[in-house]
Amino acid sequence: MSLQKFIIDIKNFIAQNTDLVIDENPVGFPDTPFYYLFFPEKNVVLHCISLENTVDDATFFQKISQLFAQKDIRVIHLWEDIWQSKRSIVESRLMSIFGKSETIPARLTQVQRIDKPTLDKFLVNNHLQSKVNAKLKYGLFLPNRYFRVIQNEKILQENAHKDAFLVAVASFSNAKKFIRDEQEYRSYELIRFANYQGFTVVGGLNKLLKMFIDEHAPDDIMTYADADWSDGTNYEKIGFERIELTPPLTFELDNETFTRKLADENTKNKVFNSGNWKFLMKLKDDAARD
């Protein structure tokens, strides 16, 4: 099959920024009308989804993910519209996955409350999903005295006049009350978390969560991981429990503008994602549960 331009662009970007070997459409991989780029050194495969092809099975991508999970291979379903519309963010995510992003230790950063415009601007520039309303908003700032750990000269120049550089954000919902097992729970949702493009704040989410928990004493925190990109293993590493894989979402996709919106009964050009992994961090005192 001839390669679409966006797949060639992905290959070129990775070749220019890493020394990883790329195995294309390996024998024995699950059947697909799309294209695989496999990186055996990282045990990662990019499932490159061209808009020229379609699938009618809403669970197709979930099934592909399950088959790769059985092989202990991480699969990323990389859609052409996402690559075209949010390329720099995708490139940053890929570099992080391949261990090529700059790292900043969370211990050098400070947690501060941020306002809605600051959060929204950061998410538009650094998160693949759209910004959403959030009641509680936090940022991780790297103080000027630690700018020496930044290697990117352009970032250094752009922020040299600042007292601190915003390197990550997290947003949370307000509390909702639920009754489970005859106990009342104050539950919050971690809505968004993002690092600044090109950087990974090591321990950043943990530090933001700690501040949030100290300030609000939640009984539990719920969050979701986009199954197109992740199985959410990193959430489990910091204390979240895997609850379920949600059904795929159905979108209406505009092939010209590379934009999506949730589908309705009149949608003709339907596409499906892989759903989301739901996680829960249980914080209520065990004694209170008994």
Regions of interest found by a model, annotated:
Residues 57-86:
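Catalytic cores of nucleic-acid endonucleases
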Residues 1-25:
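Acidic-basic catalytic patches of nuclease active cores, encompassing PD-(D/E)XK
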